[in-house]
Amino acid sequence: MAKAKFERTKPHVNIGTIGHVDHGKTTTTAAITKVLADAFPDLNEASAFDQIDKAPEEKARGITINISHVEYQTEKRHYAHVDAPGHADYIKNMITGAAQMDGAILVVAATDGPMPQTREHVLLARQVGVPYILVALNKADMVDDDEILELVEMEVRELLAAQEFDEEAPVIPISALKALEGDPKWTQSILDLMAAVDESIPDPVRETDKPFLMPVEDVFTITGRGTVVTGRIERGSVNVNEEVEIVGIKETSTKTTVTGIEMFRKLLDSGQAGDNVGLLVRGIKREDVERGQVVVKPGTTTPHTEFEGQAYILSKDEGGRHTPFFNNYRPQFYFRTTDVTGVVTLPEGTEMVMPGDNTEMSVKLIQPVAMDEGLRFAIREGGRTVGAGKVAKIIK
């Protein structure tokens, strides 16, 4: 087979395996690494099942999650792949965004078909904004009857369509175990799966290509020069002499011009996603800007006070609450750099939320926050994290 050469210019895509416990998510991950390592040895190393299964702990927004990262390449792309072994870890990762996903491989056992967690994962993927799902129909070697495979495929497609994912997404029958054992037929099924991943998961939009946004971390005055706002640029880029808008927390937004950009005490012509910068802003007093606001390309982000969110509430063992909460719960919602108090309304039919639950909620904040759908937040009580969530829908 022709050797693919390593190119830094390859698109980088973050993906993950999702699906019901015991349907073979981790085995599928291991099979992908092995088959690609055999096909493109100078690009890939195989990761054994037990390496992936012993997922190291990570902290994201104050929550501990067990999660494994592996990387591999096809001829077209470089992939970072996350696998969360436990159902709870999976849910926590989806909601906190510890590992972003540009697309997901839904693993469904052909012997079982979609199960309750399959549905829950797909629903959650929709709510946290995973852009694309395709399907690995695993354990296909154990099903002799093609009609059964077709039935399972139909069920999976209905499930995807119900959550507004692509009903025509590739559904690839595989046997991860047989591929790990080196069976040529099933090794090919993994190559087919990765060809489908290459083709169907769209290239992600890079952060630098999005409109400029920088959360304000600090504000100070430089005598003789004016007001400087500092922070890490979250997305996009900004140039000297460009107009920007300062949004959130206050009733009205303020427009101003960036007259200087500084990083590590050096002056720059522009700053881009990932840079920690100080922006010198024209005609703005120190008291006009505060932590928690964002500096943006004018007109690209708006402040809101009411939204629907999907949240995971920490269990007692994770350092969360010891007791449930009810309607009209009033914690702080930590967005980007600041806490804002909000009042929680639970979905109809939900009496209370227990520590360890994941839930939908409507929130009404006491101050406006610059937000887009998909923005993540922590739920805090007096500085202690008790939950994490993501904005699913902006109401007002």
From Swiss-Prot:
Keywords: Cytoplasm, Elongation factor, GTP-binding, Hydrolase, Magnesium, Metal-binding, Nucleotide-binding, Protein biosynthesis. The keyword Transcription regulation does not apply. Mg(2+) binds at T26. Residues 62-66 are annotated as: G2. SUPFAM superfamilies: EF-Tu/eEF-1alpha/eIF2-gamma C-terminal domain, P-loop containing nucleoside triphosphate hydrolases, Translation proteins. Residues 83-86 are annotated as: G3. It holds the Pfam family GTP_EFTU_D3. GTP hydrolase that promotes the GTP-dependent binding of aminoacyl-tRNA to the A-site of ribosomes during protein biosynthesis. Monomer. This is Elongation factor Tu.
